[in-house]
Amino acid sequence: MPRVKRGVTARARHKKVLNAAKGYYGARSRIYRVAVQAVTKAGQYAYRDRRQKKRQFRQLWIVRINAAARLNGLSYSRFINGLKKASIEIDRKILSDIAVHDKATFTALVEKAKAALA
């Protein structure tokens, strides 16, 4: 069996990992063995957090809608229920944006939700 020399491929692999670890603190950006661990862990965090980001934004939108709805005398759950009964289909992202930037429109939506609940 012939001898396999890995100089080129090993250097390429090391270079790829060290480039991915650029900007990391200390040995994590300079030493291959440590950099491999750091890059792998970073990938795991990135994968996890891409999913968590969706949850966190939805959570933020709900908190904003709840705060604005309560200023108009309605809880979040009753507000959403009222919108459903009034057959107003606006997603939470847009509702949150309206609540933050356009108080008059949000108040009108709350009034429609209250009317649908009554």
From Swiss-Prot:
UniProtKB keywords: Ribonucleoprotein, Ribosomal protein, RNA-binding, rRNA-binding
Source organism, top-level taxon: Bacteria
A single GO BP: translation
A Pfam short name: Ribosomal_L20
One GO cellular component term: ribonucleoprotein complex
UniProt-recorded Gene Ontology molecular function terms: rRNA binding; structural constituent of ribosome
NCBIfam families per the UniProt record, alphabetical: rplT_bact
UniProt similarity note: Belongs to the bacterial ribosomal protein bL20 family.
PANTHER family assigned: 39S RIBOSOMAL PROTEIN L20
Role summary: Binds directly to 23S ribosomal RNA and is necessary for the in vitro assembly process of the 50S ribosomal subunit. It is not involved in the protein synthesizing functions of that subunit.
Name this polypeptide is given: Large ribosomal subunit protein bL20
Organism field: Tolumonas auensis (strain DSM 9187 / NBRC 110442 / TA 4)
